[in-house]
Amino acid sequence: MSDKTQNTKPVAELNVEQVKEALIEEGKKKGILTYAKIAARLAPFTLDSDQMDEYLEHVGEAGIEVSDDADDEDPDETELVKEETESFDLTDMSVPPGVKINDPVRMYLKEIGRVDLLTADEEIALAKRIEAGDIEAKGRLAEANLRLVVSIAKRYVGRGMLFLDLIQEGNMGLMKAVEKFDFNKGFKFSTYATWWIRQAITRAIADQARTIRIPVHMVETINKLIRVQRSLLQDLGRDPSPEEIGEEMDLPTEKVREILKIAQEPVSLETPIGEEDDSHLGDFIEDQDATSPSDHAAYELLKEQLEDVLDTLTDREENVLRLRFGLDDGRTRTLEEVGRVFGVTRERIRQIEAKALRKLRHPSRSKQLKDFLE
């Protein structure tokens, strides 16, 4: 167990319930919390947007005002909320470096760049119309924030999903934000929508980006472990052991090893090996189901010797054994099945088989096969 107390632990080492409770306590002391601070503190956890809304209601029920004004932040909170509150450049509809897109996507980015942004008063006016059931107002509010989706999606490029897919998932989050936005809570739509968009994208990455899907709750655990791992790396100056990570996270060592194993990404068998790129990883992995060259050679020699031995029997004896033991096609037959082939009774086939096997057990024949049985 770590000797750190719950109240002095960094946010990265607290679980989601501890962070929620800490925010409530802080809000009760000050009487106010900013939406940006709440979003930033909860950002490391994979809360879905409904859970976020539920928590905001809980904050309100505790008598805490949720503000959208960054001036309400304490100076020492600047770094904590920087990533979540930094302004998005909504005029930049360029493509992130290294991202290849086709003409339709380029046209889409150009088209949404022509849509006028909304003022705070226009947002409120649209929100009131939406509250009254105006479908057209929903479309206008969503359309005016499509740039926001693109700006957020750019931050997740390189996480295993195509840029266009990131935009599509973000747009779905935007539509949910339009449906659930409550202007009476006092914060801007873009601040509220950012959470929904980011959660839609991160959840899609968790569901789709990996070859082997990892449940969202496990993604949260993996992210927490990685944060602790990085923190220990800075403190220790080396990679921490599973035991040290487990002590810091209050988890059994075996559980830490299990999480680390789950977090591993699959490696393609087509991964190039060497400088020439003419070999691949799959070329060096043993096929456990394949017959080894030595076993194959021994099998071929055994077949040859067996053929020689069977040639010493009568045609009927040889054919009965071939059918009974499936020497030709690998399928064994019953006495009755073989009897139907030869037009005799099953008892007669049993007698022929017994006589043939006695002949094979004779030293003059069996010695040829003896070496293969050792």
Curated annotation (Swiss-Prot):
Keyword Metal-binding appears in the UniProt entry: no
Phosphoprotein among keywords: no
UniProt-annotated stretches for the region Sigma-70 factor domain-4: 309-362
Short sequence motif Interaction with polymerase core subunit RpoC: positions: 165-168
One GO cellular component, as annotated: cytoplasm
Localization: Cytoplasm
Gene name linked to the record: sigA
DNA-binding residue intervals: 335-354
Entries under NCBIfam families matching the protein: PRK09210.1, RpoD_Cterm, sigma70-ECF
Any Pfam family hit: Sigma70_r1_2
Function (record text): Sigma factors are initiation factors that promote the attachment of RNA polymerase to specific initiation sites and are then released. This sigma factor is the primary sigma factor during exponential growth.
Name this protein carries in UniProt: RNA polymerase sigma factor SigA
